[in-house]
């Protein structure tokens, strides 16, 4: 792989081919084969997995097998090289809240701790959500010097919403001394996709916090790469269920390295594709 190819961010909105480095100076570099070696693996200090859009209960889809397949593949990867956690980033079910118990039972077979975000097809009130999943619609947690913020982008009616900016303002202030912040939102809030929403106030806030490393989005089943909004990478993971999108159903693996760079790729669901490395932004 040629490791000298570069392009400016302004000329390149979406990363959808293997092995890229995202640099703080605005350059994007193709990565090289080093990132696929055992030596690379030894330099990983934190590893997690993101999957979205299972759409349990959607008519005329094989949703039970979609869930069992993704759970089995994540568990296989976890046995080989453990994850710290998993995020199921929205649209867990398809509209009918009666599917929540079966969807949760399927996800409870994950061998790794998992968190969930609410998508527009997850029709539940905030109170119902917390009763089902034992976690609120907006939540945060830490692993050493790394923070993780998960927030809803919808409601019981399935409305497309901007995240709660006041909640984010409070949480970003609380986590301002952390080395890295990773954010999980089902719907892209930068209007970078056909089905995204436009949340300029949120990105005004995000742009002031240089420890935000990435925003992870689902929702757009046909989006599998990385898009840039005000120097913040928005990272997509395609889908693992539903009836449209990429021709595979997969999940995204994210690896925080000892040098604080972030390496990420999609499993489709067996092979690595769409690899990229996010270097630390200049503080």
Regions found by a protein language model. Name each.
Residues 2-24:
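N-terminal secretory signal peptides and thylakoid transit peptides that target proteins
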Residues 25-101:
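N-terminal active-site segment of His-dependent metallophosphoesterases
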Residues 39-49, 140-150, 176-180, 227-233, ...:
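Beta-strand-turn-beta hairpins that frame and shape the catalytic cleft
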Residues 42, 62-64, 68-69, 73, ...:
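Binuclear metal-dependent phosphoesterase catalytic core
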Residues 49-69, 94, 124-135, 156-162, ...:
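Acidic/histidine-rich helix-loop elements
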Residues 51-52, 86-91, 114-120, 151, ...:
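Active-site neighborhood of phospho(di)ester-bond hydrolases with catalytic His/Asp-centered motifs
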Residues 73-85, 158-233, 262, 273, ...:
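His/acidic metal-ligating clusters that form di-metal
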Residues 89-108, 124-134, 193-196, 225-230:
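Metal-dependent catalytic neighborhoods of phosphoester/phosphodiester hydrolases
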């Amino acid at each position: 792989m040629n490791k000298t190819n570069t392009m400016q961010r302004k000329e390149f909105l979406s990363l959808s081919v293997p092995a890229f480095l995202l640099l703080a100076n605005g350059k994007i570099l193709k990565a090289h084969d080093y990132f696929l070696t055992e030596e690379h693996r030894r330099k990983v200090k934190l590893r997690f997995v993101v999957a979205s859009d299972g759409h349990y209960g959607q008519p005329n889809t094989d949703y039970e097998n979609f869930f069992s397949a993704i759970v089995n593949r994540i568990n296989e990867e976890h046995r080989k090289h453990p994850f710290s956690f998993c995020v199921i980033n929205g649209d867990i079910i398809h509209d009918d809240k009666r599917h929540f118990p079966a969807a949760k039972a399927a996800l409870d077979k994950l061998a790794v701790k998992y968190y969930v975000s609410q998508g527009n097809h997850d029709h539940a009130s905030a109170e119902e959500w917390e009763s089902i999943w034992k976690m609120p619609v907006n939540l945060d947690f830490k692993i050493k010097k790394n923070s993780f913020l998960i927030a809803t982008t919808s409601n019981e009616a399935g409305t497309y919403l901007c995240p709660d900016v006041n909640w984010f303002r409070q949480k970003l202030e609380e986590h301002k001394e952390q080395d890295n912040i990773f954010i999980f939102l089902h719907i892209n809030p930068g209007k970078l996709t056909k089905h995204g929403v436009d949340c300029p106030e949120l990105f005004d806030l995000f742009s002031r916090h240089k420890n935000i490393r990435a925003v992870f989005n689902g929702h757009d089943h046909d989006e599998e790469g990385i898009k840039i909004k005000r120097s913040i990478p928005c990272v997509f993971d395609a889908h693992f269920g539903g009836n449209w999108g990429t021709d595979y159903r997969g999940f995204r693996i994210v690896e925080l390295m000892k040098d604080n760079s972030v390496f990420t790729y999609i499993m489709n669901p067996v092979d690595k594709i769409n690899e990229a490395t996010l270097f630390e932004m200049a503080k």
